[in-house]
Amino acid sequence: MAFKRKVLGKTDYGRRLRLLKSKDRRFIVRITNKGIIAQIAEYSVNGDRILATITDKALSKYGIELRGNNLQICYLVGYAAGVEAQKAGVETAVLDIGRKKFRKGGRIAACLKGITDSGVDIPHGEDVFPDKKRLNGSHLKNPVKLNEAVKNFKKLEEKA
């Protein structure tokens, strides 16, 4: 009998084992129907220990009152996760996307760009990130001004 999470299609145990054998902390990205969740976790015998968690709803703490899972929100969640990870003492991590497929220029790639821009070192190729036009929201009706949002993050970092 297979594990329940494998039968339900929730966990790829082969991929999880490879990630855990690396003994690096994991940057976990989960895209939901209405939002995005980013976490930094490390393995523990008693269960994974979550060091930092950021969702699209938590961006209001940084002065961004938008929710969703578009490309810009994913970038900002990744950036915020990087800020929180550095507060927790995390300098390097590996990307954990679960059973999702990684698409070049997609939402997970935008989240990855956000965390690398914040200063956390995650192995990646430079060609996987979204175009700057898409990241700046030129394809959206009401784009977020990313430069202003990142400045808000930096101001809050200096205050803390």
Curated annotation (Swiss-Prot):
Task: Please give the biological process terms from Gene Ontology that the record holds.
Answer: ribosomal large subunit assembly; translation
Query: What keyword terms does UniProt attach to this protein?
Result: Ribonucleoprotein, Ribosomal protein, RNA-binding, rRNA-binding
Presence of the UniProt keyword Ribosomal protein in the record: yes
MF GO annotations: 5S rRNA binding; structural constituent of ribosome
Q: Which NCBIfam families does this UniProt record tie to the protein?
A: PRK08569.1 (NF006342)
Q: Which PANTHER family does the record match to this protein?
A: LARGE RIBOSOMAL SUBUNIT PROTEIN UL18, RIBOSOMAL PROTEIN L5-RELATED
- Family listed: Belongs to the universal ribosomal protein uL18 family.
| Assembly mode | Part of the 50S ribosomal subunit. Contacts the 5S and 23S rRNAs.
Please give the name of this protein: Large ribosomal subunit protein uL18
Q: Which organism is it from?
A: Thermoplasma volcanium (strain ATCC 51530 / DSM 4299 / JCM 9571 / NBRC 15438 / GSS1)
Q: Its gene?
A: rpl18
